[in-house]
Structures are given as C-alpha cells and as structure tokens.
C-alpha cells in the first residue's frame, strides 16, 4: 500500500464501521468495488497514482462503460518532481489520464475544508459518476 495512506488504511482495517478489503492490484480493487456497488454498497477505492495506470483498462471497460459510480481516492506520488524516480512520469501525467477518461477530480489540499469534500462526494452520489479525490503527500496524517 501507499505510504501516504498507511495510517488511513490501518484505521479502516481496525474500525468495524467499515469493511476494508485489501486487494492485490488496483484493477482487482476496481473489480471488487464494482461488485460491491452492484450489491447495493457505496465503495471507495484507495490507490496510489501508479495504480491508476494499472487500472485504466478496468475503469474504461467496466466502470465507465457500465456507468458504475466509484469514489476513487488517489495519492499523488511524483507531484512537483519530488519523489522516487519511478513516480515522476505518472505524477506528471495522472491528471491528464483522468481528464481523458472524463473523471471529475478534486485535489485535496491543507486549505480544503470539510464542506468542499462533502459537496464533492454528494456530486458523485447524486450524479452517479466516478470521481477522484487526489491527495498530495502531507495533506492527511
């Protein structure tokens, strides 16, 4: 799992209010979340942006094709060129990939407030669309 989400994943896995299901790949997580949606749940997929590349086929041939509304939380590794070399290209192109797939994006910053996040989540639910909440390193603890 992404180190940016480490504490969040630990919280979710220990909290009985949530059903945290770890996946071996991001495309597997997309498939599990799609099935959960079809079973009447409101899934959230947590992934590192390198996993976005792995999941593009699952997003385009399943989620977007069949209009399955998923809430993606994607960490922005490689943002601003400050990261390990393997994260730099995806960090540079991630927003472009999401734009090409017509997936609305909200970039969470330390200045974002709770109402902005709630409104973004409501838009996702009300419009029945897949959206992506982008997290930069250091925004969440």
Question: Where do the model's predicted regions map?
Answer:
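Thiamine diphosphate
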Residues: 1-141
């Amino acid at each position: 799992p992404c180190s940016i989400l480490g504490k969040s994943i630990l919280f979710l896995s220990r909290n009985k209010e949530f059903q945290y299901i770890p996946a071996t790949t991001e495309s597997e997580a997309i498939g599990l979340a799609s099935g959960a949606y079809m079973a009447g749940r409101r899934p959230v997929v947590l992934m590192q942006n390198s996993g976005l590349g792995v999941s593009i086929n699952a997003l385009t041939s399943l989620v977007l094709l069949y209009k399955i509304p998923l809430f993606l939380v994607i960490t922005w590794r490689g943002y601003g060129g400050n990261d390990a070399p393997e994260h730099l290209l995806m960090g540079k192109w991630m927003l472009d990939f999401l734009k090409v797939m017509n997936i609305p994006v909200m970039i969470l910053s330390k200045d974002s407030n709770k109402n902005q996040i709630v409104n973004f989540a409501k838009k996702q639910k009300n419009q029945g669309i897949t959206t992506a909440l982008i997290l930069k390193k250091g925004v969440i603890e």
